Swiss-Prot record:
InterPro entries: DNA_gyrase_inhibitor_YacG, Znf_NHR/GATA. Coiled coil: none annotated. GO terms for biological process: regulation of DNA-templated transcription. Zn(2+) binds at residues 9, 12, 28, 32. It comes from Vibrio parahaemolyticus serotype O3:K6 (strain RIMD 2210633). Residues 54-64 have a biased composition (Acidic residues). It comes from the Bacteria. This is DNA gyrase inhibitor YacG. GO terms for molecular function: DNA topoisomerase type II (double strand cut, ATP-hydrolyzing) inhibitor activity; zinc ion binding. Gene3D superfamilies: Erythroid Transcription Factor GATA-1, subunit A. Residues 45-64 are annotated as: Disordered.
Length: 64
């Protein structure tokens, strides 16, 4: 018998059973999944890292 894994929805905190019966995992619903997607699309969320170098940072193709 396999152990049931329960995770919390990253958007609202609701418990979600991790398995085929939860098609939006790790989210509890399509709504929470789309809210999260919107936050990424609006750049409210980001993966930490070095900032991109742009022309405003003094970089140009003429330097190389």
């Amino acid at each position: 018998m396999s152990k049931i894994t329960i995770v919390q929805c990253p958007q609202c905190g609701t418990d979600v059973e991790w398995g085929e019966q939860s098609p939006h995992r790790p989210f509890c619903s399509k709504k929470c999944q789309m809210i999260d997607f919107g936050e990424w699309a609006d750049e409210e969320n980001a993966i930490a890292g070095a900032p991109d170098m742009s022309d405003s940072d003094g970089w140009s193709e003429d330097q190389y």
